[in-house]
């Protein structure tokens, strides 16, 4: 099921009392297999190997995408680490607020200066959403892409 075509997500957007049900479904049911996996390339395991097991560190995840699906910081969070997750998608940040209340979760597009940029957008929870014009050119050859103006910080 494609997230941006999800009828349930569209209902949850219309009726706020359904949002927590949607978050639970998307984080723990739809993506249950990711609850038992590490990050995509085991970066989190490598980081945990560098520190004593009792060490509680801090992380910064820019472009955090999803609280469980191929997430680089989920294992760290489970080991007691805390940090900051930043993504330009408000739905992603809402899910992080639900799944990781111990973290600071910020909806923002990061840049070296405060300007308006175009967000090239494929869907609510699509990891290919981008601000990069070169990446957009590649996406355009394969996907139906739209854009929105957003402000960077």
Describe each model-derived feature in a short phrase.
Residues 1-153:
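Phosphate/nucleotide-binding beta-alpha loop and adjacent structural elements of enzyme active sites
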